[in-house]
Amino acid sequence: MKQKVVSIGDIKVANDLPFVLFGGMNVLESRDLAMRICEHYVTVTQKLGIPYVFKASFDKANRSSIHSYRGPGLEEGMKIFQELKQQFGVKVITDVHEISQCQPVAEVVDVIQLPAFLARQTDLVEAMARTGAVINVKKPQFVSPGQMGNIVEKFKEAGNDQVILCDRGSNFGYDNLVVDMLGINVMVKATGGHPVIFDVTHALQCRDPFGSASGGRRAQVAELARAGMAVGLAGLFIEAHPEPNSAKCDGPSALPLDKLEPFLMQMKAIDDLVKSFPELDTSK
């Protein structure tokens, strides 16, 4: 199958090209912390030769608790993103939750993300498509990999085929997620070769049934990411924090920032090896 290439400026995203890192922090906590984290990602990815897109949310609209931190909001968030782009020359990805956010966000960032909980909301899909921006679609935990073709078709019908898919795990009973590595290739086939990336951070979530925030399995981030990279991915999605236990959102799943370089060295080694193999058709 011919693999679709999605371009984020000069960055090419495809299942058979070297992987792209979509990384940063879960939510913008402050301007200074965003600058610090972005600078570290840029330094490490440039050293390792990994194409890089900075990720952060300006508003976490789907927090479990009404009391949880959501972010600085649209106006302040866009100012921070603009400064990061000017300071470090990075591409930026962030998520939108409402139709009214689509155009102003697309005027600043390079990729707009459709959250998993909203991935079947047709009006939001159409509004995102009309911006002409590159789209990253999070696979809902409750949707099978094969059904992702329907979501991509909505974007195409609305005039935008620059769509990347992102697996972040599937429901496994109550309050737990599991990643079906076979589903990655199912998504590729269901969408006619669209790029698929893997969000290892959110796949590590594991909830306390009565808690007000998500727990996580940070200690297993490397082994789960290695498994994903071994399948062959267009990209990897990872969030890091200098003090994960103090992070304002999803700290239990965040990679410690000082572990980013050795972590990415492993991911790049696996990606280079897997993509050096000739295609092997075992269907016949």
Curated annotation (Swiss-Prot):
This is 2-dehydro-3-deoxyphosphooctonate aldolase. The lineage of its organism: Bacteria, Pseudomonadati, Pseudomonadota, Gammaproteobacteria, Enterobacterales. GO terms for biological process: keto-3-deoxy-D-manno-octulosonic acid biosynthetic process. The gene is kdsA. InterPro entries: Aldolase_TIM, DAHP1/KDSA, KDO8P_synthase. Pathway: Carbohydrate biosynthesis; 3-deoxy-D-manno-octulosonate biosynthesis; 3-deoxy-D-manno-octulosonate from D-ribulose 5-phosphate: step 2/3; Bacterial outer membrane biogenesis; lipopolysaccharide biosynthesis. Its EC number is 2.5.1.55. Keywords: Cytoplasm, Lipopolysaccharide biosynthesis, Transferase. One of its GO terms (cellular component) is cytoplasm. It comes from Yersinia enterocolitica serotype O:8 / biotype 1B (strain NCTC 13174 / 8081). It is an enzyme of class 2 (transferase). PANTHER family: PHOSPHO-2-DEHYDRO-3-DEOXYHEPTONATE ALDOLASE (PTHR21057). It is found in: Cytoplasm. Pfam families: DAHP_synth_1. GO terms for molecular function: 3-deoxy-8-phosphooctulonate synthase activity. It catalyses: D-arabinose 5-phosphate + phosphoenolpyruvate + H2O = 3-deoxy-alpha-D-manno-2-octulosonate-8-phosphate + phosphate. Its main location: cytoplasm. Belongs to the KdsA family. Coiled coil: none annotated.
